[in-house]
Amino acid sequence: MAEPLKEEDGEDGSGEPPGRVKAEPVHTAASVVAKNLALLKARSFDVTFDVGDEYEIIETIGNGAYGVVSSARRRLTGQQVAIKKIPNAFDVVTNAKRTLRELKILKHFKHDNIIAIKDILKPTVPYGEFRSVYVVLDLMESDLHQIIHSSQPLTLEHVRYFLYQLLRGLKYMHSAQVIHRDLKPSNLLVNENCELKIGDFGMARGLCTSPAEHQYFMTEYVATRWYRAPELMLSLHEYTQAIDLWSVGCIFGEMLARRQLFPGKNYVHQLQLIMMVLGTPSPAVIQAVGAERVRAYIQSLPPRQPVPWETVYPGADRQALSLLGRMLRFEPSARISAAAALRHPFLAKYHDPDDEPDCAPPFDFAFDREALTRERIKEAIVAEIEDFHARREGIRQQIRFQPSLQPVASEPVCPDVEMPSPWAPSGDCAMESPPPALPPCSDPAPDTVDLTLQPAPPASELAPPKREGAISDNTKAALKAALLKSLRSRLRDGPSAPLEAPEPRKPVTAQERQREREEKRRRRQERAKEREKRRQERERKERGAGTLGGPSTDPLAGLVLSDNDRSLLERWTRMARPPAPAPAPAPAPAPAPSSAQPTSTPTGPVSQSTGPLQPAGSIPGPASQPVCPPPGPVPQPAGPIPAPLQTAPSTSLLASQSLVPPSGLPGSGAPEVLPYFPSGPPPPDPGLTPQPSTSESPDVNLVTQQLSKSQVEDPLPPVFSGTPKGSGAGYGVGFDLEEFLNQSFDMGVADGPQDGQADSASLSASLLADWLEGHGMNPADIESLQREIQMDSPMLLSDLPDLQEP
């Protein structure tokens, strides 16, 4: 029997055993718990939003240990956003540092699949009274956890598209040397258009470049156990981006079966579930385990072979299982990277190297390694808010257009010139008198013209004699008035302002491409509906004609084809028909008996049918095969017809496959049950089954069916008609205190996880201890509350009855 494993990892995952505190007497536990519960609700459920007149609060999305998030509408534009309120943000150093870290990271990232900061509200109170931080984020209706564990249809195309967006955002994040460390379905925000964004960067860290940074990496590590990588559980001291790829693999498997892949109830059970599927770790991994007793425990277990993924997910897509197997490996170096996963054949449908950017420059975590006080963290957060608004104001000034106004210079008005009439004789085209010489001017002529009217000369002055056919004074006055009006309008429009440079072409982003694809999909669906309507109308007419004159023999009837495809197939059918033989010469006329009927020699096979005559191309048999090959290749579809998309089974079908931990150590208890996620073979699609045809060319009928399918095929998964409301966990508000405390105090704590209801395991004791640090609670109160709600360390092994210390 394997030696019982004692606790080797502390609450921060660093390997130090946590200190033991004596339990409080039983008769005082109820009063302490009631006091702590009242304090938690009073400090956490503060949903009063003071956002001024710019935003209008709609409803509360969710609340948690770190804040409250509500949906809102911007009054000026009507745009809907999510506003996250972090109350008492500077009371606890851990929470204040988490807020600073998340603000810095989200300001650094600009990606379509990562939640973005739209605004940070400026403090409206003096610095000394500033306590709550308001962050305006993208509004997403739901999260992936709610989608998976609901009745919402989730097809293979949905899984493929969600996984592609997750890996696309992860590639961008990893290129900035950032590890998320807390990827789980509830932290992946989703909307009804199947768009996915990664949220909650409060646990993010940078890459470890030296062994001295391992302790920094594991500090405050309270990620959900079900998605935690083996190197974190075994203290392998190899903390790379592969940690996130393990979490992605667990999420991928959960989407395929709509059930958690490794729902461990405690530390040992989690290791057992992983080894039941992946087998015993390699000797190199076992030797790299940092804790001696953990290494001895694994070595004492009987060797186990890995289970094929086809057995775990029967009937699932082979390419999907191939990618899943490359994500879930014990060795971190053997796991596939996010960039390589995007190139996997399973995601080839969406992969576009030009639309999968990297982040430059890398994010700097130097501030996170410093020992900061609450006052310094508050100053840093205020500086981040001011920097955000300074950058946004600078961008607005760059795109603002203000024409410069300059005074108009004056100059002498040019003397009037007599303009001859166009109908005057050619000899009269010469001017009446040569133009007078302009007075010399030392200054250069200004660029502008004085448009002020000069006073008219006195009427007593003698006008020059007019020639026959010259333009009258009234005409010249009208022309001058028109010219003056034109010049005034040009000056009024700003001729002195510099010409506006042509707007540079904006780069096409993934969101714009997504909108273009959705618009194309909408137009395709409308065209498909129109074609379907015309097809039904044509079938109705054909049925009516068949009732009157017999059934229709058109092999293309009832198919949705474009005009070009239909003309191409008709041409191919004509080319495939054998050429008619030349008519034989008529024999010499001979007298025939008057009683004989005239006969004719048939030029081809005579049909035995007594029905009406049919064209030669429609007579089945060997004679109907094409005699000569067509001049071009047969039109083929771009790829094989995809299998019909199936909806993953509901959780009720998996109730009998519950993963029950063994009552004792491996090898001494009940037989272990492998995780089994039945999905069944995909049912045949009647729309894709080729129907028998009487056409003489079966390949023509097959091509017709394939082209008909290609006319309505949609490359994107169908949008959700309605999405379940999210819990707000993806916005970084922490676990839901209302639900957690109600379950803990009112209903008691269940023996095991409730499938489909929560995607979080027991949290670290440091989470509550840090949260209550500034609220005047003594260690006895904290210990009593921890024991009541069972918020034990994720590495605590003493909660198993069969793993007590000797």
Curated annotation (Swiss-Prot):
Domain of life assignment: Eukaryota
Primary localization: cytoplasm
Protein role: Plays a role in various cellular processes such as proliferation, differentiation and cell survival. The upstream activator of MAPK7 is the MAPK kinase MAP2K5. Upon activation, it translocates to the nucleus and phosphorylates various downstream targets including MEF2C. EGF activates MAPK7 through a Ras-independent and MAP2K5-dependent pathway. As part of the MAPK/ERK signaling pathway, acts as a negative regulator of apoptosis in cardiomyocytes via interaction with STUB1/CHIP and promotion of STUB1-mediated ubiquitination and degradation of ICER-type isoforms of CREM.
Segments of skewed composition (Low complexity): 593-603
Cofactors named for this entry: Mg(2+)
Modified residues (N-acetylalanine): A2
Tissue specificity remark: Detected in testis, brain, kidney, lung and heart. Detected in total embryo (at protein level).
Gene3D superfamilies from the UniProt entry: Phosphorylase Kinase, domain 1 (3.30.200.20), Transferase(Phosphotransferase) domain 1 (1.10.510.10)
Pfam families with a match to the protein in the record: Pkinase
Record note on quaternary structure: Interacts with MAP2K5. Forms oligomers. Interacts with MEF2A, MEF2C and MEF2D; the interaction phosphorylates the MEF2s and enhances transcriptional activity of MEF2A, MEF2C but not MEF2D. Interacts with SGK1. Interacts with PML. Interacts (via N-terminal half) with HSP90AB1-CDC37 chaperone complex in resting cells; the interaction is MAP2K5-independent and prevents MAPK7 from ubiquitination and proteasomal degradation. Interacts with STUB1/CHIP; the interaction is enhanced in the presence of IGF1 or MAP2K5 and promotes STUB1/CHIP E3 ligase activity.
InterPro entries (UniProt xref): Kinase-like_dom_sf (IPR011009), MAP_kinase (IPR050117), MAP_kinase_CS (IPR003527), Prot_kinase_dom (IPR000719), Protein_kinase_ATP_BS (IPR017441), Ser/Thr_kinase_AS (IPR008271)
Record flagged with keyword Nuclease: no
Chain ranges for the short sequence motif Nuclear localization signal as given in the UniProt record: 505-539
Species annotation: Mus musculus (Mouse)
Record keyword rRNA-binding present: no
Protein name according to UniProt: Mitogen-activated protein kinase 7
